[in-house]
Amino acid sequence: MSYSSNTKNELARIEGEQSCCVRAELAALIRMSGTLQLVGSQKLNIKVTTENPAIARRLFKIIKKQYNIHAEVMIRRNARLKKNNYYLLVITHSMGSSEVLADLGIMKKVDDSFDITYRIPQELTQNRCCKRAYLRGAFLGGGSVSDPEKTYHLEFVTHHKELSEGLRDLINSFDLNAKVVERKGNYVVYLKEGDQVVDLLNIVGAHSALLDLENIRVYKEMRNNVNRIVNCETANLSKTVDASIRQIQNIQYIEGSIGINRLPDNLREVAELRVEYQDATLKELGEMINPPIGKSGVNHRLRKLDQIADRERGKSI
């Protein structure tokens, strides 16, 4: 099961919410994944679809608890897309769909017609707990979060621009930085940074998913740090090996041209040690010299040998 599905399963099992929060969550869930079906003069059915059985159970329970309505539940096979079954919950006009829509701020009856609104009702999101519940419902109905092993990305998808802007503003009321982009005829509200995704998961109550993400972040950071250290050490080792090869080649050239014995004692000693101990570091070479000298002193003498080799090569041209 995907990380996003696990997150939704966790959210679908949250219990003990107040009535105001249940209304906010239900309003968002119906708005994000529901459709309205006109079945007669001023008669509407509410249809909500989901592929997640935990969300279907939650919908059924909160509709029954809040409105004492036993929604009709059907299981459909998505044969065309060859995906999992999906669940269809229906609240018919006779069950009280109009009353539910009005209570959730989705529909208002004006004279002999319906006024469907796509704004987020302020009366449902006045309290901070209700704002959290609305975002939880929006995520259950039309949200997803990427596998944190790959990237940090959380989004809500809706057909309606006004709703997307309302979601963005509601998310940003928690000091986040959600943005809206149009994609293939839909409006996508998204967060991209790891810290922002963590904060949103905390807001909606997905604490287990949050901990999983944080554990993955720590692991990835440790892995990246190890890789950086290894790469740095590999690069340094490569430089050391290249320098050692160059120094030995220069010493061998000096031996073949003027002879190492003609070098000053301090340079001759370093040259002989460098050839004998080809894998030794500058520090180790310095400790072999009598009296011992530091890395900078060894490096200075080796550079002198490089200069002598270059000078002798110039004479042979």
Curated annotation (Swiss-Prot):
GO molecular function per UniProt: DNA binding
Protein species of origin: Alkaliphilus metalliredigens (strain QYMF)
Gene designation: whiA
Job description of the protein: Involved in cell division and chromosome segregation.
InterPro entries on file: Homing_endonucl, Sporu_reg_WhiA_N_dom, Sporulation_regulator_WhiA, Sporulation_regulator_WhiA_C, WhiA_LAGLIDADG_dom
Identification of the protein by name: Probable cell division protein WhiA
Single GO biological process annotation from the record: cell division
Record key words, sorted: Cell cycle, Cell division, DNA-binding
Keyword Cell division: yes
Disulfide bonds listed in the record: none
